[in-house]
């Protein structure tokens, strides 16, 4: 037998293995490449959710409650926290109501959103930085009377109804708030 007849099957095997490895490298490498990068956008480091409706932006939406047991029981009241921003330079808006499947939401205070202005709903516990001076008409309160038990780690559906912008639906998490560090 000539040496070409002996090494030809070995060469074909090597070429096939090398081709297979090259194909697998390109397939697996292509899984991470794409037109939309998963790390190209920055997300806010806040506890709450967010939603944008036309020129209105609702940010850091969360239920603020300290949970000591397995659930926050029905009948209890908890605070709904958020910041509403009106990005329109021409149109004022007003938060008419908030509804949820976990209970009734009572809005108290001035709920008008001025042009290019903000509306704070609730006051954050444990704020380390003093906020800029706010007028009393920039702060409202939303109190949720629970109709069913809720717990940390889950989100609950809320609908925000605005006079001009319409409705925005968002899943709102329960924020445990500031608690002493466990040791």
UniProtKB/Swiss-Prot annotation:
Q: Where is the signal peptide?
A: 1-30
What InterPro entries does this protein map onto? PCuAC_sf (IPR036182)
Q: Which UniProt keywords apply?
A: Cell membrane, Lipoprotein, Membrane, Palmitate, Signal
The protein's predominant localisation is membrane
Q: Where in the cell is it found?
A: Cell membrane
Name this protein carries in UniProt:
Putative lipoprotein LpqE
**What does UniProt give as GO cellular component?**
plasma membrane
Coiled coil (UniProt feature): none
Give the residues carrying a lipid (S-diacylglycerol cysteine).
Answer: 31
Gene3D superfamilies, per this entry? Answer: PCu(A)C copper chaperone
| Keyword tRNA processing belongs to the record | no
């Amino acid at each position: 037998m000539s040496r070409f007849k002996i090494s030809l099957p070995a060469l074909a095997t090597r070429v096939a293995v090398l081709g297979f490895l090259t194909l697998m490298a390109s397939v697996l490498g292509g899984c991470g490449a794409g037109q939309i990068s998963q790390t190209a956008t920055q997300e806010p480091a806040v506890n709450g959710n967010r939603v944008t409706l036309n020129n209105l932006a609702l940010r850091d939406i969360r239920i603020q409650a300290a949970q000591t047991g397995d659930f926050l029981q029905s009948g209890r009241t908890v605070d709904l926290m958020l910041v509403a921003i009106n990005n329109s330079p021409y149109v004022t808006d007003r938060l008419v109501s908030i509804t949820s499947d976990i209970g009734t939401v009572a809005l108290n205070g001035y709920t008008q959103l001025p042009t290019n202005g903000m509306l704070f709903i609730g006051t954050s516990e444990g704020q380390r930085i003093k906020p800029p001076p706010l007028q009393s008409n920039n702060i409202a309160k939303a109190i949720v009377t629970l109709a069913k038990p809720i717990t940390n780690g889950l989100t609950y559906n809320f609908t925000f109804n605005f006079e001009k912008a319409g409705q925005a639906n968002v899943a709102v998490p329960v924020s445990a708030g500031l608690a002493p560090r466990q040791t």
